[in-house]
From Swiss-Prot:
Residues 1193-1337 form the (+)RNA virus helicase C-terminal domain. This is RNA-directed RNA polymerase. It comes from Apple chlorotic leaf spot virus (isolate apple) (ACLSV). ATP binds at G1060, F1061, A1062, G1063, S1064, G1065, K1066, S1067. Residues 1634-1741 form the RdRp catalytic domain. Residues 607-639 are annotated as: Disordered. Residues 607-635 have a biased composition (Basic and acidic residues). The lineage of its organism: Viruses, Riboviria, Orthornavirae, Kitrinoviricota, Alsuviricetes.
Amino acid sequence: MAFSYRTPQEELLSRLPQSQQEAISGFQYERFQKEEEKKVENFSFYLPEKTREWFTKSGVYLSPFAYVNHSHPGCKTLENHLLFNVVASYISKYSYVACLSIKSNKMSKMERLGSNSVKTYDILNRLVTAKDKARYGPLARPERSPCPKKTNIFIHDEIHYWSRDQLETFLQVHRPKNLWATLVFPPEILAGYKSSVLPFLYQFEIHGKDLVYMPDGVRSESYTQPLENGFLLSSSSILVRNKATGVEIRYQVSLVYSLGSHHLFHIYPTEDLMKEEVRRFGPYDLFDVGSLFVKPVRVPIQDFPLSVFKKIFIYLSSLKKPDVQSAVAKLRQLSDADISIESVFMVQEFASRVEKNGVGSWSCSFWECMKDWFFDKLPYREVLEKIGLANDFTRRLMKIKPLAFDIHTTDRPLTVRMVIDQIWGERQSSCDDVPNIIFYGRKEWLEHGLLPKVKKGLAKLVPGRETGGSDYPEEIYSDLLSSTSIWRSYDENLRHRKASPIVILKSEKAYSEAPGFSSNCISLCSTPFGEVIERTPFEVERERKKRELSFGCLDFHIRKMKVKDASELSIKLDEQNKEGLRRQKRKEKAKKTRMIPVHLLELGSDQKEKNLGQEASKGKGIEQEERRKSDEAKFDSGPSGVCSIKAENPVDAQHIAEPVPCLKLNDLIGKEKICSSGLIKTVGNDYLTLARQIEDMPLAQLKNRKAAYFCIDYPMVYFHDKISYPTFEATGEIKQIIMRARDKWGANFNSALIQVYNDGCRLPLHSDNEECYDDDEILTINVVGDAKFHTTCHGEIIDLRQGDEILMPGGYQKMNKHAVEVASEGRTSVTLRVHKRDFSFESKLRFIKGKFDCLFVSIAEIIHKKPEEVMMFIPHIVDRCVSNRGCSLDDARAICEKYEIKIECEGDCGLVECGTIGLSVGRMLLRGNHFTVASVRRSSMDSLANSSKELKSNGVLDHVMFNFHKRLRSVEPDLTVEEIKVDSSRAGKLLKSLMDGMTGIVSHNSTHEGWRMIKGINSTSEMRSFMSMIKGKSEETRGDLFDRVQELNFMKVKIYGIFGFAGSGKSHAIQNLIQTEFKGSQGVMVICPRRFLAKDWSEKGVDEKDIKTFESALKSDVKGKRLFILDEISLLPKGFTDLLMLKMHMEGILKKSTIVCIGDPLQAGYFCPKDDNYLSREGEIKRLFKDGVNYKWYSYRINKFIAKKLAIETMNDFIGIDEQNLIYKDMPSAHHFMENKGNHIEVILVPSMIEKELYSNYGNVMTFGESQGLTFNCGVIVLSEEAKLCSDAHIMVAITRFRRGFCFALGSKGSKEDYMRSMKSGLLQRMCSGIGASKEFILGSSSVKLILSEKDVSKGAGVDEMDREARLEGDVWLKSMIYLGKRYHIVEPLGQVIKLTENAIKCHIPVCSSQTLGPELDNIQAREFREFKGKNGWSNQFREEAGPNWKHPYRVNQAMSYEAIYPRHRMDDDLTFLAAIKKRLRFDNVANNYAKFKAAESRGKYLAKVFLRHVPIKCGRDQRLLDQCRQEFEETKLSKSAATIGAHSQRSDSDWPLDKIFLFMKSQLCTKFEKRFTEAKAGQTLACFPHKILVEFSPWCRYTEKVLTANLPDNYYIHQRKNFSELEDFAKRFSNGSMCVESDYTAFDVSQDHTILAFEVELLKHFGWDDKVLQSYIKMKCTLGCRLGGFAIMRFTGEFSTFLFNTLANMVFTFCRYEVPDGTPICFAGDDMCALRNLREIDTHECILSKLSLKAKVNRTKVPMFCGWRLCFDGLIKEPCLIYERLQVAIENGRLMDVIDSYFLEFSFAYKLGERLYSHLEIEQLNYHQVLTRFFIRNKHLLRGDSRHNISELEWLSDEDSDDDKGSQIEDRRRGYSNCWGEKLQNLF
């Protein structure tokens, strides 16, 4: 992300020395000074920002010191630009100019324009409007002074008051040589636009026949002019008749310059020049609102800025729930203060449509296409849309483009028609009266335009009165003349349209010519002149039909143009034909100069422009003799160097249409004629250089050979049969070979096929007749090796040796074939051909279809288009697909960028985003070089979760749920799909069992009205009949019920299944899908056999009333449901799925619904003793999925111990509890030992209900079956006699319920050994004995085949792919900046670290009461002496009353609370914020910042050298480390919760300017030791940067930090990303109790000025930063600002890597200020510095230090402090009073639980020093330390985690006597959090 593009000149200039830059800038200054001096008077008006921007983009000079006020400055500036910049440059070329309607002062200014000054002129003014009297002075008269004739005239802003007749009269009388005229007329009026396209510059209104023009929208400055007098904009010439001589003179009208509504015309007598046929205007940053909202709205608005509209639309599309309020807020953000009310209403209307109906999709289904087609054919569709009966909003939205229109010119005053661009459509041009009035005049328009139109419309309403259709031949479809009216065909420019030519066949003879021969070589077998072959009857008949068709076309055009014959038609169209010929010649010339693929060319000019006149003028009677004479004449006048041979008879002459080049002697030397067919061979050529180049070429491996295809100018695709070749542009030696062959053989070779063969390779007989070639010459060069060349023109075999060439002449391929046999390994050939054209699209399609088109098919499916449409839209991708035999991810990206869509592609390399615009529309899978569609994004209709209200539209519900399985496939890779028929007998058995009360408890027919389960049954008797019917025992064979039941026999239903091991996440994917996309939906029903499972589903977004047991599901109304989830399907009664489908079918929803089954075949199934003998024997899973299921063979739940016993992989890293798998003698023993080890028993699992009652007093007790589907941490499994009888499935349920582990407890008499001996062989026996179960044993217990899907549990292979997208849902802008593909983590090798531990010393601390510490509070001053004071009050840093959370008794005066010791900063404290701004910020402008930085570059280099002298770092960049840093940054960014990321999404807004920050103040309690009892302190400012800045720079900063850390000498310590244990080790290693030095900096952040920036830039260059990133960093530092203004160069807290750059500045300052010998230990942390030796100050670098803003006070002490810690040779000590006072503040505010752990860890560093503490602390601090010790010992129960463990280790060291040495070493303590310092040191990026 570079901030701006830099040209090579700018790059060079930035690298030049300062003096040279100043020299170059001096030239620019002088030029600028002259420019300003000349134009300041006319271009210094103060303009609004938008107007200034528009003028600048339009190329108008504006003075940078604009201060002059004016009523309409925009139009005044535009007028001055037109007069003094444009007009003056033209009229100054003439020696004399007569000036009309211009004030004298303007002309006097024109005299002083230097080279463009007007020399000699006269001013001839007259009074036209009422204001002209005041404008021109008292001498002006209504009549004009005599104007000289035949001279140069300039008319300023008067001609728009003249009618066309007046202008013609003026030209007729004065006959000027050149007439220059300025015109003010909005051109958009001629396009039918009713409001200004540049409303900030001018506005207008139309009142009848008048136009009211308002400059700058100022109504008081408006003036009125005739509306019809804008005719000049559509006039190409004016015809004037001389009354005296009667001679007509044509004046050309040329629009020389046009800007906004001001135009300059040049009118002069016609010369033979090309006319202006079309005048183009635009594009404007507008779109027609009326074209989007066809339905009438109350808002009178026609235009709206398109750039703003696009941003609003993209923003709404990026929101999950777009709403009107968000759209209006976005409008306000994007607009200035002047927002029209109409714009607000328009945005509200648009947003409400998007919110209500969505936008629709880019493509549509077949039925939607049919609907659109039908809608387009409606005769009154505009009316239907206006009255709201039809809506085509989406298609209109897609067609929105910037406003641009064309005006077609003409020289006919009454037949001018406006041809408007397609953006408006013909509908508007024919219906809009304003342009027609301008063109025709009011009278003519009413008579000739309006009345015929009304008559034509009325004729359509009367049957039989329609105008007759054209009699144009039906075989011709491409001629536009056949479908247009006479006036349109006459006036409209059709030369750019593809029209059918007029065909006249002149030959009466049935002869076919033999192919001619053209070659540079003599051939003995060329066709003799005059030889003809008689045509076949088929050819004769075809030519006859062509001739008849041609004559039919000609007759139609003659009648249509109302002429007598073809000669008159030729005269009438002659003018167009001349221009057409010129255009055709230019196009043909351009085509010859360079060959490019067909999709980069325009349509051929020969198809666009046909010389209709010349062909038509020949008529039907033209004989063959005339054609022959014409051909002879062309032939005789051929170019020199071509033999002109004249035939003796007319027949012979027909065959000499092409010139035969003359042969020269040099062309025949060294050539051998092989046969009479013209085959020529040369020998002895040297191609060694070419052979060496071919060895390095990227040739593709084909069968028995390698090959590649080269073309001059552009790589053309080439393929044949099933083979394609990679194509490249011919360069170097290849190109030279082609060019030399051109000269040598006289053939226009442009392509080369290079092939390297294997020995023995054979190419059978073939012809090089692909469609890309004509029958031209082909030259084969045998570069290396030997081969045999065989042809069909003679029987001999030609031997080819190294350096041989063989030429097949033109025409050879039609009659002969050739073959090649390679005789040596590595034989290399180069075949030169004339590649005439690209392959047709049909040929390319045939080649790739079904083999290489998977990418096009996939994208077409996602965007709902045909693959062929995608291919035609991006033809160059098709070419790459052909050449590469397939597509790549780059091709996918290119297609997405062309369509402006985003598609995700998941492949072996991870998830990749293709495209950058909008949200993802779908996802593709790339597996084995094959693209497939994984999912298609649902449209806005597809969400079931749009509302919690009940859905009334079943159409929307059906559409969504019918496609639910597609969404499920995309999130569940192990989905099993099976198509089954409903088993009516199976359903009938379960239904009868329910009716009879054998199954269930609430479905009995008599007591619970079970007959209500089936729709259409109203009584018990009807239910009995229905059951007989579905069993096939009923005699009834008619009726609705019978018919519906019979329909089931012809239906197959798809069933979806998700199966896996216990804890494998079977329901995770579908629950997440419901939670994110279908939460609160009324269309989902979940059927759960356990109430515990139901609670889990309700928490995941399913309404509780939609979670049913199997009985309540059968009895409920399912008509509104479309998704049925059967959880733990193995626990459902046998036949339930069939009965459910039967019920759904009876209610008419079976075809529209999706059924998903979730379960585990290895776990327990349904069992009920009542119905076990009646229901079917086959379980539900085996019934539905006979062929097997995809099975998740892994678990996230069970620990590693159990996973090993079951031979399965687990994601749970916990090994298992110590009691795992132990068998205790009874339940009390198990309970005691489990609880003693801290393993809380959450559940006791028993095999039967009797035992459940028996153990109920121990807590939560469940049977094995009841626990199925649930998860616990720890528990006990009871081993009783009942457990021996349980199946392996039930045992599997029991042992897989626990995350941490379980133990067994005997529940029967006897010992463990007795129980084990009586146990049968099975899963329980294997687990109790410790043997475990093999994979085969477990799989063998399944009722169906399991297709295992194992999971890769190795760390680092894309661990967080799914999490990243979910995390970024709330910030869609940030999602586009984060890499969402697969990540690879480098696993560092583990090594054994041996750490020596010290013995702790016991100590007894004297007792000290906390009351003795109270008097220190007397140091608190009164608040009035401490606060900042301002005019409006005090600051609010010190509290005088208890806080709202103070829940403890007031032990002290509230004004003397512990919080009052320290100043507190709050965001709402204005005075503190102002003090922060005054102290911590500096302001300056951008120019000064850049200038200071440039001046400091040499000092920066000096400082960098000093730094690198002390910290040697190798120059260069480690790209792998940089990539790793970028990955770490993104992972850190995404480690926050989704809610936190979403809350900061405004920072990702792309509209946030990169040079603006949001400034605020940090809220904190300043608990530093030096802040105790002080006065108020200035706040700490924080800067909030946009995410785009952080995403760009933070990876580079991380990289810099890692490189610095890796190269840092051991004696330097930087406290970044380290815990205080490492600082402790450093202090122990280097402290020796000597004098230490500390630097106390003042205003450190503000002092990071231009010199420090120059130092950073030089250092970062050395680190290997990319130059673009560096330039962006410099620009950011120099241009940064906020609402307060622009900042000077400084550091901000909150800036990326603030700590790192502060540390670097700290280090270089230290190296310059002090003499630092090698090995001196120094600690650095931001602005904190502590040297553990006594350093001497030096003045060696004083020349640099004196120019630094950074200053420091030098402190020398024997008690060094660093980051708030005392450093000593025994370790670290935190000031005990600080910890105590912070604890008291936390107690006062009720926050003790939040901070006690971190404060204890700080305290423990001092406490573990034991008796050694006395030598480092004063008596006052020791008292605080003793009070803290008592506090933490007494409150150890409040500690958590490691703190709780550590306090037990330290406890024995205090006041207890014990010989039990538990080991006093505390290893790897981590500091955690340390209030203000911790906040300061945290990584800010």
